């Protein structure tokens, strides 16, 4: 195993932005440099990296501009067609039996067309668990070999040494849960709102319990704005960034939790992994364990049909209010009307995941929801989710668990971009946990 570095750079290559965070190990860990730069257009999509040369050139520039000189790197591996993660309940067994189970199950259930994969698994030891329980939990990761090789190739082009290739749910667990002791007392849901995908990861007492990925993100909101307002997507994206806001006074009236009858409805769990039959062997493989591959991010789900927009026509002015609205306010209403069905769908999927977690973890309840990623800072989104789900919701702060000593950027810059840096900081924290 590679020697644990004292300083490492976490690298998060997204479809819109490349994010880097340099962390020095310590108690507490120290965040020494960060950087964010646009991903070259067309170089990365929902399935993974398409243009390694363009990504490598952009990453090399970003590291130089950010003052990051360390060579030890932890890369995030992501993409709905590149990586999956599962938390599985399997019969309790010894390591040799578990290895056989995993080898057989991974070969039977590889979710990719190309069978060449890297995989890893780890037994989950939860605080206070009953040693006589007939079952145990295992976190399983499977990554496309080509995706792993692509990251190693990029590291070589940039002159980096890949200490580890990690996955988003565990990185978010480090930056938002493990580095913040008060977050380890109960269950927390982390919603990472990206451009092409949204992840829902639930942690119980600091440990990953339920990872899920939805194939929907900010780009779908951009397309919704473009279609409703009949604009080019580039203009719609700019309008979304400038004006997207949850207008609470425009939300259709409903029950406190946005479901018939109030409270949480009983979902069909469509798109949520089913509870496996008792006694059935479950998934995985050690198949040439990959150095540093920590468990990946969930499997893309087939999204439910988006409900028709409740805004079939422009709202009539309320009595006593002027009939005409300022142009900017009217435009903001139009943008909200365009994205509302997607926000409603997001809330439905969060609720579905919460109910699934509750069904599998008797007595455990989610105390709060944390938002990160580019969509996390849509004004009032946290309030909308909290009101709809009935769980306190806020924008996550990955800076709470580290000491800030960033040399190239002021604290204001780092704080204002913290929601984008949660994965990169979690990658940089890899040697610390």
Question: What feature does the model see in each segment?
Answer:
Residues 3, 12, 22-32, 69, ...:
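Small-residue (GG/TT-enriched) beta-loop-alpha framework at ligand/catalytic clefts
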Residues 1-105, 109, 149-151:
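Non-catalytic, solvent-exposed interaction/assembly segments
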Residues 166, 171-174, 219, 226, ...:
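Glycine-rich phosphate-binding/hydrolytic loop that grips phosphoryl groups
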Residues 245, 366-386:
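Glycine-rich phosphate-binding loops at beta-strand->alpha-helix junctions
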Residues 76-178, 368, 398-401, 423:
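Active-site neighborhood for divalent-cation/phosphate handling
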Residues 147, 151, 171, 175, ...:
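Phosphate/ATP-binding catalytic cores across multiple sugar-kinase/actin-like superfamilies
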Residues 208-347, 373:
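Phosphate-binding glycine-rich/basic clefts of nucleotide- and phosphate-handling proteins
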Residues 59-72, 231, 353-367:
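Phosphate/pyrophosphate-binding loops at sites that engage ATP/ADP/AMP, CoA/4′-phosphopantetheine
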